[in-house]
């Protein structure tokens, strides 16, 4: 495996990690894993990229605070519900349609566009995650899969075509609304763990665009 393929695999893992955080509340077992050597090393390695240092530091700070927070898992689940599962007036709803479509209704054109992309690349939405296709977790999972598919291409033109598809997807399907999503989450997540995660998401997307554009 060459260095670029290895780097792509790391990128895919980051997007899948983020997808998992937006898909469901963390269980008690998952929350405990965030204090493990493996995950703390993962976060430390990410923080060594200067552009990511501050956003990873915010996540680590909140993880450390959770260790002394009473009923941490229950409270963090409540934070998740407060941040993402309320109404559009008091939550940061994780659907592109709420930000990109004038109707501000679920399952609008951005969701159809995402369904078309899933079909185009023959990527199946997880059956147990019954959400509109433009949910942030589905979009991030798709991107992780698209990156892995890039590594599977056998010719340089095909590889470059898939790299270009990643760049287009991030710009059109994610950075078109993720900054506003992050802003709302920072306003509506009182404790701040998910606000830190959305801030890292936007920071990483912006950095990834520079990588894909060859800057």
From Swiss-Prot:
Keywords: Chaperone, Cytoplasm
Pfam families: Nitrate_red_del
GO biological process: protein complex oligomerization; protein folding
SUPFAM superfamilies listed in its UniProt record: TorD-like
An example Gene Ontology CC term for this record: cytoplasm
UniProt-annotated location(s): Cytoplasm
InterPro entries, per database record: Chaperone_TorD, DMSO/NO3_reduct_chaperone, HscB_C_sf, TorD-like_sf, TorD/DmsD_chaperones
Family, as annotated: Belongs to the TorD/DmsD family. TorD subfamily.
Primary role: Involved in the biogenesis of TorA. Acts on TorA before the insertion of the molybdenum cofactor and, as a result, probably favors a conformation of the apoenzyme that is competent for acquiring the cofactor.
HAMAP family cross-referenced by the UniProt entry: TorD (MF_01150)
Protein name (database record): Chaperone protein TorD
Organism: Aliivibrio salmonicida (strain LFI1238)
Gene that encodes the chain: torD
